[in-house]
Amino acid sequence: PLRLVGSEMCIRDRLTSGGDAPGMNAAIRAVVRSAIFYGCEAYGIYGGYQGLINGDIKRLRSQDVSNIIQRGGTILKSARSTEFRTEEGRAKAAAKLAEHKIDALVVIGGDGSFSGARLLIQEHDIPVVGIPGTIDNDLYGTDSTIGYDTAVNTAVEAVDKIKDTASAHNRLFFVEVMGRDAGFIALRVAIATGAEAVLVPEIDTDITDLEHFLEKDYDPKQSSGIVIVAEGDKAGGAYNVAQKVGEAHPEYDIRVSVLGHMQRGGSPSAFDRVLASQLGVAAVDALMDDQKSIMVGIMNKEIVHVPFNKTIKNSKGLNPELLNLVKILSNR
């Protein structure tokens, strides 16, 4: 990213690392075009940190990011790199930046991507600004991450379809959504689809309590039911929970649906496109102001700068009011 040309700073590089999220292309577009707006050059690193180590770097012009704002995935591709986790790997990455006369970096990703960026800063003093891009919405210091809104809408659309077939047969469906360590997707999907219950990693699941709740709320002869399960739920995911409930209640007609990677794909929502555009420009602005080792986020509709140390070390908790909302609205 940044190169000194006379008295001007020029943004030079950006990469997407870790899991992809809808809206990353909109963020890439915003970084490239805002850099060009300031009279700077923009480069893309293909394949995340491993691509940086390999020197897979290409200049991006305005036309290169035309017609990508509506596309899911990332034109820069994304990958996890075990080599970058070593000091030798990071030294190679820093050498490639120096070789291409790159002075700063914009990283779009989650806490793993930012942890790698922080090490690059500590060991090689390279300015890095992060843009939160993860469907999990689990990054401290921002109300929403790029991709979260789209993932929720994708899951809601799928669950609505599942509810149709569940209703036709009076079935109880356990629907698993993404969320290995966080239940933000599960919680919002549960509220939006009128689910009977939601199981999230942040709260230990008591199967007996769930069974008692379903006994009151679900009549297999007269109604259907939906339970939303985050993949990281401590009871072991939707299949394990469904099996345990089924053993206790063989009269239930139980089915399981795992939504999986469909939640990462698809055209980003309008909300994610706007958010990505805002944060992409904010990242360039931060580098132009000599900021480094920060994530740009949005809190209460305002752009904020959050130190990497803070967003990596702190956890973002679920809203207890929303958890209570599921309980209140599930009563029949």
Task: Give the predicted meaning of each segment.
Residues S7, L52-V107, S113, I146-N153, ...:
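Glycine-rich oxoanion-binding loops at beta->alpha junctions
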Residues P1-I11:
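Single conserved hydrophobic/aromatic residue that forms the stacking wall/gate
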Residues A42, V107-G109, S115, L119, ...:
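Accessory alpha-helical/coil subdomains and C-terminal extensions
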Residues R29-D56, N67-T74, D253:
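Anionic-ligand anchoring segments at beta-strand to alpha-helix junctions in alpha/beta enzyme folds, i.e.
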Residues R29-Y38, K58-D64, L119-G130, I146-T150, ...:
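A glycine- and small-aliphatic-rich helix-loop capping segment at beta-alpha/alpha-beta transitions
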Residues K244-R332:
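C-terminal non-catalytic interaction/assembly regions of soluble proteins
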Residues R12-G19, T74-A79, D103-V107, F173-E176, ...:
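Short glycine-rich or small-residue beta-strand-to-loop segments that form or flank ligand, phosphate
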